[in-house]
Amino acid sequence: MYSRKINMIILGIESSCDDTSAAVVIDGTAIQSNVISGQEEIHNCFGGVVPELASRSHLSAIQPVVEKALSDAKISLDDIDLIATTQGPGLSGSLLVGYSYAKSLSLVKKIPFVGVDHMAGHALAILLEEETPDFPFIALTASGGTSSIFLVKSSTDFELLGRTRDDAAGEAFDKVAKVLGLPYPGGPHIAAHAETGDEKSIKFPRAWLDKDGFDFSFSGLKTAVLNYHNKIVQKNGSITKEERADICASFQQAVIDVLVTKTINAARTHGISTVVLGGGVSSNRALRLAFSHECDKCKLQFFVPAAKLCTDNAAMIAVAGYHKYLRFGPGNLSDDVYSRSQLG
């Protein structure tokens, strides 16, 4: 256990996919700045993230984003006590930009450095809110790259209970959006169309996999949506606005049913009374409402961060890095990035 400096100032850096972000957080709780530079316009015409374009965009964005985070917090690099950056999982080229930049700052300014697992950031983002859960809790981290359920015993002790076996929830949203001719990223656009659709109109499959397990699979659902869409197009030449809305609503509900059911089952199985939601998919309003309703019905406490802390951001990385540093000390500058999560 490393001694904690009062009012420790952490610089967080995130570049795991297509968002370049830098944040300044004090003591793992107080956000002083949280700057995010997205790449939606770059990738929209491709219907998804192009890794090479993403890494190039990070290269041009990282310096000004960090400078703005420091400026917004009204501090300089000389005031930073710890640098925390995403080490994985994610796109290797994207990860390397933020990770290498953070290590360079650490070497030049002689500031302690720690690499952070992106999923830990999503699970601990709730600690940035005024109302926070007690440990242990069950955390669902649902994003574009992965969907996982963790038993979070402390801020540095995670047990992996279940993960996606193929497409993650966010990835399924993006792929279905592309099929329906909706822009990238798909989640917000599907959610918007779903508001005017009937979630009971189409019986899309729910992949429960093992009855008592907590793994996810959304590739079958994605294929079912593709086949349903193609049948309508083959018959009528195109789909109507109403048909698109019904597809969005029915698809979204199928994802929600699986995420909610498996997460609550994990809490029941392990005797945990608190559920925490994190990751980009958790900004979905229908998912939040479903979790709130089911947790209330099951007498479970439910926590979810503000939407701005659910999508990829450096503030959550700063929080996870702060706690990791206090327990394990500074990271090894010779370590490399990793594409698959090593959490739990």
Swiss-Prot record:
GO CC terms of this entry: cytoplasm
- The UniProt annotation places Fe cation binding at 118, 122, 312
Localized where?
Answer: Cytoplasm
Q: Which UniProt keywords apply?
A: Acyltransferase, Cytoplasm, Iron, Metal-binding, Transferase, tRNA processing
> What superkingdom heads the lineage?
Bacteria
For the biological process aspect of GO, one term held by this record is:
tRNA threonylcarbamoyladenosine modification
Binding positions (substrate): 141-145, 174, 187, 284
GO molecular function (one):
iron ion binding
**Cofactor-binding details, from the entry:** Binds 1 Fe(2+) ion per subunit.
Give the reactions, separated by semicolons, that this protein catalyses: L-threonylcarbamoyladenylate + adenosine(37) in tRNA = N(6)-L-threonylcarbamoyladenosine(37) in tRNA + AMP + H(+)
Cofactor annotation: Fe(2+)
Q: What is its EC number?
A: 2.3.1.234
Q: Which InterPro entries match?
A: ATPase_NBD, Gcp-like_dom, KAE1/TsaD, TsaD
Q: Which family does it belong to?
A: Belongs to the KAE1 / TsaD family.
Q: HAMAP family recorded for this chain? A: TsaD
Q: What does this protein do?
A: Required for the formation of a threonylcarbamoyl group on adenosine at position 37 (t(6)A37) in tRNAs that read codons beginning with adenine. Is involved in the transfer of the threonylcarbamoyl moiety of threonylcarbamoyl-AMP (TC-AMP) to the N6 group of A37, together with TsaE and TsaB. TsaD likely plays a direct catalytic role in this reaction.
What is the recorded name of this protein?
Answer: tRNA N6-adenosine threonylcarbamoyltransferase
